[in-house]
């Protein structure tokens, strides 16, 4: 099973449509759960702490937690597919923080810190990118045409 915990709601229809498409495609390979948590507009420190508490409340004790962060490890699509294949039995939980990042308590709970790039992406777009890469990983794992 793959779970994605993310702060913030998807607002744009075209992002919602893309996410629905990848959710449909992924249903062939794995159970997928997406948990959207509210983003807060407090001062930055309080916001990170509150979002962190909400994130941790959605993580199960046995989940293999992957935080997505700019200073995490970069993987190729092939290496990400190896990583997912190796850890899928452990219920992989990907965590996308709010605009101010992740709390230290969430980072402490992380089993693996992953970065897709040193670039900064809008959270709505990044969620689509993440689902596409997870889908690509399953295509690679199953030796199916898609990845080049």
Question: Each PLM stretch: what is its role?
Answer:
Residues 15-19, 45-49, 77-81, 107, ...:
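Conserved strand-to-helix beginnings and helix N-cap segments that scaffold or border functional pockets
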Residues 30-31, 36-93:
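S-adenosyl-L-methionine/SAH cofactor-binding core of RNA-modifying enzymes
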């Amino acid at each position: 099973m793959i779970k994605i915990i993310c702060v913030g709601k998807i607002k744009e229809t075209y992002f919602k449509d893309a996410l629905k498409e990848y959710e449909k495609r992924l249903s062939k390979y794995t159970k997928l759960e997406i948990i959207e948590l509210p983003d807060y507009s407090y001062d930055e420190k309080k916001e990170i702490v509150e979002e962190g508490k909400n994130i941790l409340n959605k993580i199960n004790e046995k989940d293999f937690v992957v935080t997505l962060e700019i200073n995490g490890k970069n993987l190729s699509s092939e290496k990400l597919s190896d990583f997912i294949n190796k850890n899928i039995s452990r219920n992989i939980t990907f965590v996308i923080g709010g605009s101010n990042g992740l709390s230290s308590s969430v980072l402490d709970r992380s089993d693996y810190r992953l970065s897709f790039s040193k670039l900064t992406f809008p959270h709505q777009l990044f969620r689509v990118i993440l689902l596409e890469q997870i889908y690509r990983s399953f295509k690679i794992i199953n030796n199916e045409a898609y990845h080049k």
